[in-house]
Amino acid sequence: MARILITSAIPYINGIKHLGNLVGSQLPADLYARYMRGRGHEVMFICATDEHGTPAELAAAKAGKPVEDYCAEMHEVQKEIAAGFRLSFDHFGRSSSARNHRLTQHFAGALAENGFIEEVVERQFFSVADNRFLPDRYIEGTCPNCGYDKARGDQCENCTKQLDPTDLIDPRSAISGSTELELRETKHLYLRQRALKDEIEAWIDSKTDWPVLTTSIAKKWLHDGEGLQDRGITRDLKWGVPVRKGSEPWPGMEGKVFYVWFDAPIEYIAGTAEWADANGKADADWERWWRTDRGAEDVRYVQFMGKDNVPFHTLSFPATIMGSREPWKLVDYIKSFNYLNYDGGQFSTSQGRGVFMDQALSILPADYWRWWLLSHAPENSDSEFTWENFQSSVNKDLADVLGNLVSRVTKFCRSKFGETVPAGGSPGEREHQLVAELQQRLAAYEACMEAMEVRKAASELRALWVAGNEYLQSAAPWTVVKTDPEQAQAMIRLALNLIRLYAVISRPFIPDAAASMMASLGCEDWSWPADVGRALEVLPAGHGFTTPEVLFRKITDEERAEWQTRFSGVRS
């Protein structure tokens, strides 16, 4: 049994996330966590809300609430929606937790002690209209790289280029929109990433199995232009982790907080500590996942994120870990994703464009969305959500292929043999061929899941469903029953067991449907099918079942047209 630590990029607290956010991090991370648990491995799956920095302050101000109250409220909202999508976190934490405060301050102290922090007096934009310094995300302007006119002072969300506020063309305050900005002196802490460049580069070069998307972004930022730069890790804000050197005050840093991108990844560790606290466990129980001197040396650590988060996870966070000179676990594999676009344009939380997670759940259950998003995950290139494609995928894959098999088998058995697994007959050559095909396809599915090739895994799973349908079509038990009822019973006995097999292997993708299938079969045996032949004998003759309701309903043309109009791209 392996030990697998999984973290999803933590979503900003500023509002409900859209489907592009979901498929770029949390959902594929959940798929992998569910699969690994299903294979019997020990899994720790951590996520949290990212609550500090400019986005939280601006969103709270817009909502007319104190930032602490806003964050507490939105954490519960995001937690509830995550549960609605059946995201199986072991803990969904908060970056504003006391654990994260202490750990962030601890890392800063360790970095300073090792000479990787520099105090820098810099010139920063001060808004005369707002009477305050403007940290990077409080400034908007035109990106000098791609021309996007809503680029932020830390990064352009259009081309992903990291920026400094002074790089922006025609900068303006994100608070008031004022362009009356002055450059004034202020002192900040910088993480000396350039001093760690050789270590970081050697570490990245050692990851020969990483996706091209991950390594290409990391190496681009290591080498393009002037290469890896030192990074400011403090801000002139009120809301955040107060700057301290470990447990001690940091002279000259009074009233400042750590930059959100310094403390946010540390929440992966702190969130695991929060899990221990919430479950009455000792520090040793979370440290065995993170400290290589306390049991984490055999842990495989996998991160999931959108491509815009890759630089922080391949450069800045590893620099924090390495520079601490403490035995913390570094990530083993980073699964990154391109963007999911929406109906001819971009999803955007800041612009309110696209289908958002709460809206999605209000019209269809989670499994419909999970299946489409995962089977169309933007792995090798950007992908696009269209209502026509969504309707087609749901109707063909879920309703016609899987749902139809479950319905036909259970209803036919009920009408001919009752709601018990029939006892007659024995498998023939056709059944043996099916078992061989399923065994081969299952191995391909497992290989894709192990490799985190999400779209290919969905394709292999669908092929497994199709194989069962093709068997039923060729075996035709509804015809055979007229001349050889014993053989028809053997076919249906295998087909009922096939439903259980599909429930087990489909659970990572469509957990609610899998649970419904198992409940209708009156079965609680979720063991992974190492041997397909044996797996198709789990339900014995005489075992009772109930004929389920429709597993997946079809989306009508009228519904598709109505939703397309309702979600035309702007969230009010």
Curated annotation (Swiss-Prot):
Q: Could you tell me what the cofactor note in this record states?
A: Binds 1 zinc ion per subunit.
Q: Which GO biological-process labels does this protein carry? A: methionyl-tRNA aminoacylation
Keyword ATP-binding listed? The answer is yes
From which domain of life does this come? Bacteria
Enzymatic class? ligase
User: Which GO molecular function annotations are given, in alphabetical order?
Assistant: ATP binding; metal ion binding; methionine-tRNA ligase activity
Q: According to the UniProt entry, what is the EC number of this protein? A: 6.1.1.10
What cofactor is this protein dependent on?
Answer: Zn(2+)
Instruction: Please give the function described in this protein's UniProt entry.
Output: Is required not only for elongation of protein synthesis but also for the initiation of all mRNA translation through initiator tRNA(fMet) aminoacylation.
Protein name (record): Methionine--tRNA ligase
According to its UniProt entry, this protein's organism is Cereibacter sphaeroides (strain ATCC 17023 / DSM 158 / JCM 6121 / CCUG 31486 / LMG 2827 / NBRC 12203 / NCIMB 8253 / ATH 2.4.1.)
